[in-house]
C-alpha cells in the first residue's frame, strides 16, 4: 500500500479544513466535466484496447467485477469472504487487472469531492462495515463515533457521481479525494453516459450528461469517515476521505 503523496504550495496537509474547503465540489455535471475531462482524454488515448474494453464493460454492468472483489460468489449476499472468491469467478479476472492498470494512470493535481449514492440499507451497511440496525436506529452522533474508530477499505471499485446530486440516491457519501487519488472519469465513454461510449476518441466534447455521470475510484481504496448527518427527512449523509490506495 502506498500513502498518497501531495505537493505544491498550498497547505501541506491534504486533510486540512483549508484544503477540503478549497477543493473542487462541482455543482453541475458541466462543471465536473470542465475539470475532469482533459485528464480522462489523455489516459484514454494511451489506453490499450483491452483496458478500454474492460472499463467500458464495467460501466455496462459492474457486478461481475465487484462481487468477487468483495468476496461474493456469483450473486450478492452469497458472501464467502474477501480473498476467498477467485477474481475470474464471473469471467472478469483479466478485465479486473486491465481496469486496475488503467485507473492507476489516472490521477489529478487538484483536490476533488465526489458523491456516491447507495440505494439500500443493506448496501450502505456493507460498505461501512456496520449492522443495518446502526443505520436505521442509531443516532447520527453514535453512528459517527463508531465509524470514526476504524478506516474502511473498499476492496471493489467505487463508482461515484462526478458532481453534487449526480449518481444514485439513497444513502449519500461525500468523498474527498486529495490530489493524487487514483480515479477515472467515465462519463465520456460510459455505456450509460451521453458521450461517445466505447468509440470515444479521447477528444470529442459533449454537451449532455447521463444521470450516473460516473467517476470510478480505484479498487482497494481505504476511506476515513469524518462526519455523519441526518436531515429532516431522515436521510443519512456521510462525509469521508480517501486516505490510502493500492
Segments (PLM) and residue ranges:
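Mono-ADP-ribosyltransferase
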Residues: 2-246
